[in-house]
Structures are given as structure tokens and as C-alpha cells.
């Protein structure tokens, strides 16, 4: 959060601080900054969703606003992509210059879309799944048309299928999941573009408990059963269709996370995709 809203030096100062009392104050300041970032991020996402509705028929969503902080537009773009299941550019406006962050998937390359608009932008680049762009504010509408024309020129098929997370391991039940497995997977870090985190899928798991968390019940914790074992899974800012009912069967694609509390370690699932079956 320090790097997104101000400077990453604040986090570095905390790590280097030797005085415990000063370190505590610096940690508190960072925590306050993180809360501020979450508030700004949430407000920006709400505005972006409203603006996206005006362009809901576009193949590529391009939303812009003067209130967007360019430190969090990438996070907002990820939120829009998850909600609308389309490539997204979120643009912050500051006077005559605008800065955008893109998130994409499948065969639509965000960086190629930016390069295709080279005549109307100031600069830009990135990779297939994410890119950045700087352009004159007056050219935002032209940029929106350019990236949508580029999408149409590709004549893409089955894009939505490519939005689904890849599955590395198909599970019959939860028996292979353990802290030891999580620790072995952790040796493969850092994960990112070109080194994806391993994913798992289980089908027809039964929901035996559901907990909604957060100030707006936007976070979800499910306890699933394979018939013999139980396994908890989490999804922050979960889509509405992920909130399965008790006794409902679900297919879930997930990665692994570790929950440490009072010296106890427990593996939990991080939900990437959930498909509800029938009650």
C-alpha cells in the first residue's frame, strides 16, 4: 500500500528500524495507509463498475475518471475483469494526461492492443495479460475505439473458456492436501507470469458450512466435504454466484494457502473458480 499511494520507502524504513517503539509507530502508520488504500480501491471499483455499465456491449471495457488514483488502477482493472469477464483498461485522468492499466486473458494481448494504438498514445507496453499506457486525455474515446476495433480484427473464439483458470491436478478427494504439500509447492515461488501457481480441481464437493465476512459480507468462506474429509476454502470479494447454499454440490478450482494461528498451521483453499451444480 505504501508504494501504491505514497512511497515504498516507508515500508523499507520499517524493516530497517532498530528501535522497537519507533517501529511500532511506523507499523501503525503503514496499517493506516493500508486501510486508506482499501477504502480508495473500493470506492474506485464502485465508480468503475457504474461507468462500465455505459459500455457493457463493448468487447473491451475502457473506463476513465479523474478520481482514480493511478496507484490502484491495476487492482481496479482486475476487479472489473472478474466481474464483467472482458479485457479491461482503467484510466486515471490528471489534466491533459491520462494513465491506464490493463488486464486481459485468453488470446487478446493487452500489450499488442496498446501497440496497435501507437499513433494516439504517448507511450505504453507490458505483456499479454497486463499492460500500461499513457495518452492524452483528449484521446481516450479514440483509444476505446482502437482497442475494440483491434479485438474485432482478431475474430476470437471461445474467449470465455480461456478465462477459466487452468487445472494442474484433478483431485478425487481432499486426501492429498496437507501442510507438507503446501510447503513443497512454496519452494517453487515466486509465482507470477511464466511461473504460475499450481492449481487443483475437485468436482461434486458438498457445501456443509458457509460464512460471509467483511463489512458488506463480500468475502466468502466455505467448508466442503468429499464424503469423508472436510476442507475450508476462501474467496475475497467473491462474485455473487460463488455463494453456494448448504448441501449444494460444487466444482471448485483452487490454489493452496496457509493459515497460521496460535502456533497451529492449517492449509486452506483459495477459490479461483466455483461452479454450482444442484441442491
Which functions belong to the PLM regions below?
Residues 63, 221-226, 234, 269-272:
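Short, acidic/hydrophobic/Gly-rich beta-strand patch recurrent on exposed beta strands
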Residues 139-144, 246-279:
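OB-fold single-stranded nucleic acid-binding module
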Residues 171-231:
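Accessory interdomain/linker segments of ATP-dependent helicases and helicase-like nucleic-acid enzymes
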Residues 151-161:
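Flexible helix-coil linker/hinge segments at domain or subdomain boundaries
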Amino acid at each position: 500500500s505504501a508504494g501504491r499511494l505514497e512511497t515504498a520507502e516507508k515500508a523499507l524504513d520499517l524493516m530497517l528500524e532498530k528501535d522497537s517503539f519507533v517501529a511500532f509507530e511506523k507499523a501503525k502508520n503503514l496499517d493506516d495507509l493500508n486501510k486508506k488504500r482499501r477504502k480508495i480501491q473500493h470506492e474506485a471499483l464502485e465508480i468503475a463498475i457504474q461507468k462500465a455499465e455505459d459500455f457493457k456491449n463493448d468487447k473491451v471495457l475502457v473506463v476513465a475518471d479523474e478520481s482514480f488514483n493511478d496507484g490502484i488502477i491495476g487492482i481496479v482493472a482486475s476487479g472489473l475483469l472478474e466481474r464483467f469477464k472482458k479485457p479491461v483498461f482503467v484510466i486515471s485522468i490528471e489534466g491533459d494526461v491520462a494513465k491506464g492499466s490493463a488486464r486481459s486473458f485468453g488470446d487478446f494481448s493487452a500489450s499488442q492492443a496498446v501497440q496497435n494504438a501507437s499513433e494516439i498514445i504517448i507511450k505504453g507496453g507490458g505483456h499479454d495479460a497486463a499492460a500500461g499506457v499513457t495518452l492524452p486525455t483528449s484521446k481516450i474515446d479514440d483509444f476505446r475505439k482502437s482497442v475494440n476495433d483491434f479485438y474485432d480484427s482478431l475474430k476470437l473464439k471461445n474467449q470465455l473458456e480461456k478465462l477459466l483458470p487452468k487445472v494442474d491436478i484433478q483431485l478425487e478427494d481432499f486426501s492429498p492436501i496437507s501442510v507438507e504439500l503446501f510447503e513443497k509447492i512454496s519452494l517453487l515461488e515466486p509465482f507470477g507470469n511464466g511461473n504460475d501457481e499450481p492449481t487443483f480441481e475437485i468436482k461434486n464437493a458438498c457445501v456443509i458450512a458457509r460464512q460471509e465476512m467483511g463489512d458488506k459480507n463480500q468475502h466468502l468462506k466455505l467448508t466442503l466435504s468429499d464424503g469423508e474429509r472436510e476442507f475450508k476454502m476462501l474467496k475475497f470479494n467473491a462474485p455473487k454466484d460463488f455463494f453456494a447454499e448448504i448441501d449444494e454440490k460444487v466444482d471448485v478450482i483452487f490454489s493452496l494457502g496457509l493459515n497460521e494461528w496460535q502456533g497451529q498451521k492449517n492449509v486452506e483453499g483459495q477459490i479461483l473458480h466455483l461452479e454450482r451444480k444442484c441442491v
